[in-house]
């Protein structure tokens, strides 16, 4: 088998792709994984992991500022260093990316950075910074993941209308923030920035936050969010 011939070529290096790559390699296959952007995918780089890091940091800030005095703990003036908070988040991401690189190295998985395209049966073209390579594959697995959904009446402009990706990397705390969508991602972002001082309004088209969740639990969560300063407007839509 040549250097560019593989038993399995996986397009996408997110949680589905990199786990499949390691497992296939354990089973004796020669494996390549292709991704145009992030090793670890959206979840690790601009989704689940950084959002949880900011949720933890913002919770500690919120408790230090508003909650510890009830326990007889006085800290004086509590200052927010958003740059340091974001730096911690990035360090966590970097550490986990290094872990995946180590996983690939330990399992002898070849990693190609570029856009992977299935050009014909058993052929994957990888367009990277150094040109195009064509990988031969007995099997091809598509694990391309997802991207933030853009609403027709609220197109992303990177400034006033942003996706969760930008919301995880803001350089200053916005004075006001409208979150369109009361699902898990929207509520996480709203909670983070409300704890850090933003006036947050969550707009949800359905009649409860977290549609599909037990209604009583969703109601309890709504009350907790309200105490943190997050207002939820249900049965409503938004437009610029």
Positions of PLM-derived features:
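Short beta-strands and strand-loop turn motifs
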Residues: 83, 202-206, 233-235
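Rossmann-like NAD(P)H-binding beta-loop-alpha module
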Residues: 171-213
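Beta1/beta-strand and adjacent pyrophosphate-binding region of the FAD-binding site
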Residues: 2-14, 173-183
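Glycine-rich flavin
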Residues: 2-6, 22-29, 34-173, 206-210, ...
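Conserved hydrophobic packing residues within short motifs/helices of P-loop NTPase cores
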Residues: 9-11, 32, 142, 178, ...
């Amino acid at each position: 088998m040549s250097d560019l011939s593989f038993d399995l070529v996986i397009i996408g290096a997110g949680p589905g792709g990199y786990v499949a790559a390691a497992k296939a390699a354990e089973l004796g296959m020669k494996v390549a994984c292709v991704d145009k952007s992030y090793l670890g995918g959206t979840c690790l780089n601009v989704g689940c992991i950084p959002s949880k890091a900011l949720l933890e940091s913002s919770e500690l800030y919120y408790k230090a500022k508003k909650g510890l005095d009830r326990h007889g703990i006085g800290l004086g003036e509590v200052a927010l260093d958003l740059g340091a908070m974001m730096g911690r988040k990035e360090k966590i991401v970097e550490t986990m990316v290094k872990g995946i690189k180590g996983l690939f190295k330990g399992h002898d998985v070849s990693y190609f950075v570029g856009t992977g395209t299935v050009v014909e049966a058993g052929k994957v073209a990888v367009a990277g910074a150094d040109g195009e390579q064509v990988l031969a594959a007995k099997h091809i697995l598509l694990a391309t993941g997802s991207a933030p959904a853009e609403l027709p009446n609220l197109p992303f402009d990177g400034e006033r209308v942003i996706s969760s990706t930008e919301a995880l990397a803001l350089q200053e705390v916005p004075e006001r923030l409208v979150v369109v969508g009361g699902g898990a991602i929207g509520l996480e972002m709203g909670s983070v920035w409300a704890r850090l001082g933003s006036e947050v309004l969550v707009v949800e088209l359905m009649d409860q936050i977290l549609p599909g969740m037990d209604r009583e639990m969703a109601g309890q969560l709504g009350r907790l969010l309200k105490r943190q300063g997050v207002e939820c407007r249900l049965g409503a839509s938004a437009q610029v």
